[in-house]
């Protein structure tokens, strides 16, 4: 297979055929006597018929809903993932919002439990203690004296 003129031995050259309808050139102007049925229909109706493979926007509509409401939900999701729950003020804010939701959903007479004492990170994230544990080698002496729980990190008393 020979390479076309102007192409080096390692270059790939592709011939791309563009439909005449896309170039707005009729078959008479190019001297091509072979006419397609699509071109004949286009001349009869007066409405350009899009060639296959081309996207043609005929009408614009407003979006069905605002994207901003979705962005708010994703921003809150990111906020909860990246929030340091060891900060007591932030923990209280999240706990208060959970208490409000539970109070509206709980039947009368039942008191919702306070969740401020046990805040759990979402299952799709890892706690910092777990990330640090993965980075440290198993023979590290600091790691041996620490128990990692899903709710909180507690250090065992060291014996002297």
Curated annotation (Swiss-Prot):
<keyword id="KW-0597">Phosphoprotein</keyword>
<feature type="region of interest" description="Disordered">
    <location>
        <begin position="95"/>
        <end position="160"/>
    </location>
</feature>
<feature type="compositionally biased region" description="Basic and acidic residues">
    <location>
        <begin position="127"/>
        <end position="143"/>
    </location>
</feature>
<feature type="modified residue" description="Phosphoserine">
    <location>
        <position position="3"/>
    </location>
</feature>
<comment type="similarity">
    <text>Belongs to the dysbindin family.</text>
</comment>
<feature type="modified residue" description="Phosphoserine">
    <location>
        <position position="97"/>
    </location>
</feature>
<dbReference type="GO" id="GO:0005737">
    <property type="term" value="C:cytoplasm"/>
</dbReference>
<protein>
    <recommendedName>
        <fullName>Dysbindin domain-containing protein 1</fullName>
    </recommendedName>
</protein>
<dbReference type="InterPro" id="IPR007531">
    <property type="entry name" value="Dysbindin"/>
</dbReference>
<dbReference type="Pfam" id="PF04440">
    <property type="entry name" value="Dysbindin"/>
</dbReference>
<feature type="modified residue" description="Phosphoserine">
    <location>
        <position position="121"/>
    </location>
</feature>
């Amino acid at each position: 297979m020979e390479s076309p003129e102007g192409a080096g031995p390692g270059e790939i050259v592709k011939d791309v055929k563009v439909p005449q309808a896309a170039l707005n050139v009729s078959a008479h102007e190019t001297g091509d006597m072979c006419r397609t049925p699509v071109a004949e229909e286009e001349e009869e109706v007066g409405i350009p018929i899009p060639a296959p493979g081309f996207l043609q926007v005929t009408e614009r509509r407003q979006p069905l809903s605002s994207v901003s409401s979705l962005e708010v939900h994703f921003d809150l999701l990111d906020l909860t993932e990246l929030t340091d729950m060891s900060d007591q003020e932030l923990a209280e804010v999240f706990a208060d919002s959970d208490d409000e939701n539970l109070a509206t959903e709980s039947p009368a007479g039942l008191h919702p439990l306070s969740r401020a004492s046990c805040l759990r990170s979402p299952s799709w994230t890892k706690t910092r203690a777990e990330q640090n544990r993965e980075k440290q080698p198993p023979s590290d002496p600091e790691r041996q004296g620490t128990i990692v729980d899903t709710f909180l990190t507690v250090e065992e008393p060291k014996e002297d």
